[in-house]
A protein has these predicted regions:
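Primarily hydrophobic membrane-targeting regions of prokaryotic envelope proteins
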Residues: 21-24, 77-80, 84, 145
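Beta-propeller blade termini
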Residues: 66-74, 116-132, 172-182
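Acidic/hydrophobic-patterned starts of short beta strands in beta-sheet-rich repeat architectures
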Residues: 76-86, 125-137, 181-192
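Acidic, small-residue rich beta-repeat scaffolds with periodic aromatic anchors
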Residues: 2-14, 18, 23-32, 149-254
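Short glycine/acidic-enriched loop and turn motifs that connect beta-strands
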Residues: 87-91, 139-141, 194-199
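Hydrophobic beta-strand positions in blades of beta-propellers and related beta-sheet-rich domains
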Residues: 95-101, 142-145, 203-208
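Long, charged/polar, surface-exposed segments that mediate recognition or autoinhibition
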Residues: 126-127, 133-158
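Extracytoplasmic low-complexity, Pro/Thr/Ser/Ala/Gly-rich segments
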Residues: 32-122, 214-254
Length: 254
């Protein structure tokens, strides 16, 4: 998605990355930043600056009927770990999700939303150098988490709310992706917004989301012209580099 490496890269929309719940709180919304706060989460493990390779602490319990899938090595022991999501809501209506490491540890959090559709989660490495994130979707917006020291860390926007990407529900964005949007040689997390045109293929706005610990802020925004048919679809989906929510994530339902 450097120029528009949308295939698997431009999966999100520009607006949602900016802030989760920004719209409802009246916060600023950069080109394509979403502000819906329909979904929220509660973390079951605290964040710390560093942790030894191979997480073994059991900070959460993986439900017996959870949907699972192999994912990245999140604890640095060189072995792939497993992302999971409950297929049934908890007593409060939330949907727990988490990661169980090859070393036997488990950590998780819960996504809460009024959306009637299934929840889904994708784990990704933004830069390919260990900048791990989790993208939790309720098909209306995508909540952004950092993954650090064997815990999910909700990334907060300037208003102190969890950062979220819009998926066309509020009109701020349409997807999430990871591409080198500023041409500096490093992949960026971006919010995407596809704008169809009556007499053309349309354009895609890309807003870089800058991560600094538990803080997420909107960075530069640019607009590119769609050059191939699949780019419009990619700009209306969730992906990061070579992984997509549809193919590599876990879902709480069909």
């Amino acid at each position: 998605m450097q120029v528009i490496r949308l295939p698997r890269v431009a999966v999100g929309l520009l607006a949602p990355l900016v802030v989760a719940g920004c719209a409802s709180s009246g916060g600023s919304s950069a080109s394509g930043t979403s502000s819906s706060s329909a979904a929220s989460s509660s973390s079951s493990a605290g964040a710390s600056s560093s942790s030894p390779a191979g997480c073994t602490a059991k900070e959460a319990t993986q439900p017996s009927a959870a949907a699972t899938k192999p994912t990245l090595d999140v604890d640095g022991d060189g072995k792939p770990d497993t992302v999971w999501i409950a297929t049934q809501p908890d007593a409060d209506g939330g949907v727990p999700f988490g990661i169980t490491t090859a070393a036997g540890g488990t950590f998780g959090t819960t996504i809460r939303s009024a959306s009637p559709v299934a929840r889904s989660v994708l784990v990704a490495d933004v830069t390919g150098k260990g900048e791990l994130i989790a993208l939790a979707s309720d098909n209306r917006q995508v909540l952004l988490y950092g993954i650090s020291s064997c815990s999910f860390v909700p990334e907060l926007n300037a208003q102190g709310q969890q950062y979220a990407f819009d998926l066309g529900f509020t009109g701020f964005g349409t997807g999430v992706g990871c591409v080198d949007a500023d041409g500096d040689g490093t992949t960026d997390l971006v919010g995407l917004k596809y704008e169809p045109e009556t007499n053309g293929v349309g354009t895609i706005s890309r807003t870089i989301v800058e991560l600094d610990g538990p803080q997420a802020r909107n960075g530069a925004t640019d607009t590119v012209t769609v050059t191939r048919a699949s780019e419009a679809d990619e700009a209306q989906s969730v992906s990061c580099g070579d992984v997509t929510l549809a193919d590599d994530g876990v879902s709480s339902g069909p």
